[in-house]
Amino acid sequence: MWAPPAAIMGDGPTKKVGNQAPLQTQALQTASLRDGPAKRAVWVRHTSSEPQEPTESKAAKERPKQEVTKAVVVDLGTGYCKCGFAGLPRPTHKISTTVGKPYMETAKTGDNRKETFVGQELNNTNVHLKLVNPLRHGIIVDWDTVQDIWEYLFRQEMKIAPEEHAVLVSDPPLSPHTNREKYAEMLFEAFNTPAMHIAYQSRLSMYSYGRTSGLVVEVGHGVSYVVPIYEGYPLPSITGRLDYAGSDLTAYLLGLLNSAGNEFTQDQMGIVEDIKKKCCFVALDPIEEKKVPLSEHTIRYVLPDGKEIQLCQERFLCSEMFFKPSLIKSMQLGLHTQTVSCLNKCDIALKRDLMGNILLCGGSTMLSGFPNRLQKELSSMCPNDTPQVNVLPERDSAVWTGGSILASLQGFQPLWVHRFEYEEHGPFFLYRRCF
């Protein structure tokens, strides 16, 4: 089974930010993480009706003969949905979570036209569409649209029958418990999956680093979290949530670009998103960066219509909102301040442990200079401690990678929730396996 370097003892540490000597990789302590790869995947229904060995439930006794298939890992975020088979190093499919819905005036009563356009379907239609996102700050608000996205992922992207594969799903920290019950209802009743499991995103991110304890700092597209985890268990009472993330950075950048004389509209947010990814960075010291001659910051960006625009100080000014949220009229703490606040709520021993295991993840942390700036801010705020920011090269897929590792471990296999268990005990059975 593949596993990232940090997930195997003896392979060396993850990359450290700063000048401190790197510590050895923390040994994986839990039994489930020591057991190695699974010798078999989840059982799924086969056409034969040969009886199985008796089990404790009547439903289990009546199950027909089964065969082995690979589990599927799905990470649904506000910006993108990633999926692929467990055991792979990275997701094989990634599509935007934003979908297209035909405008009401274009629909006629009784017509059977497509209601949701997903992925490449957005580019292959002449229908006038309204772009919508079924998530708000990481929380699902439109389950029907999520089902449409997953239908597209399973049938069109992965080209699999979901009724033949177990599915591991990621869930954001502090999400409502009803989220998990809705996931189970959708997977078991709409897709007829044979088994499923739901795991917290922060825990999966931590597993991608090969750790069992750490302070996960996740900056995604719609929301940011600072989550302390001890021996695999998140601590919700001291978890920090910030309702600003990558999408807010994009909106702020649009305003800066227009202040510089450009004329971008909300419909061109995709172009601004591309500018952010290709041209922007996080300054180690914004005051010193402003003293650099403008000519050294100026670069050209070619728009889709062939027109060129010049970018200058807005390249690094946009990312300052993470450390000074008042720039986007937010009253919440800056990311570095929230991180220190969470650490200070821990007892002395745990705080010392987490200080050396600050784990970055999420697409917005991929901005050049982000880890070094966060390291500098934390070191400045904690002069008597030794905060250490850790980074992985593909931390934008850390949640999915952690799920891929987890679903492949032999010790994890008893934690799948099977459809017959859901049918017999109801959705509350989830909480016996997913915690």
From Swiss-Prot:
Keywords tagged on the record: Cytoplasm, Cytoplasmic vesicle, Cytoskeleton, Differentiation, Disease variant, Fertilization, Golgi apparatus, Nucleus, Spermatogenesis
UniProt xrefs under SMART domains: ACTIN
GO molecular function, one term: structural constituent of cytoskeleton
UniProt keyword annotation of Cytoplasm present: yes
Mutation effect (G362R): In SPGF86; uncertain significance
Annotated tissue distribution: Strongly expressed in testis. Also expressed in other tissues.
Sequence segments annotated as region (Disordered): 1-64
Gene3D superfamilies the record matches: 3.30.420.40, Actin, Chain A, domain 4
CDD domains membership: ASKHA_NBD_ACTL7
Location in the cell: Cytoplasm, Cytoskeleton; Golgi apparatus; Cytoplasm; Nucleus
Consequence of changing G246A: In SPGF86; uncertain significance
Record carries keyword Mitochondrion: no
Source domain of life: Eukaryota
GO biological process per UniProt: acrosome assembly; fertilization; single fertilization; spermatid development
Comp. bias regions, Basic and acidic residues: 55-64
GO cellular component: acrosomal vesicle; cytoplasm; cytoskeleton; Golgi apparatus; male germ cell nucleus; motile cilium; nucleus; protein-containing complex
SUPFAM superfamilies: Actin-like ATPase domain
Compositional bias ranges of the Low complexity kind: 20-31
Family: Belongs to the actin family.
Disease per UniProt entry: Spermatogenic failure 86: An autosomal recessive male infertility disorder characterized by acrosomal defects of the spermatozoa, resulting in oocyte activation deficiency and fertilization failure.
The protein, known as: Actin-like protein 7A
Organism placement in taxonomy: Eukaryota, Metazoa, Chordata, Craniata, Vertebrata
Gene: ACTL7A
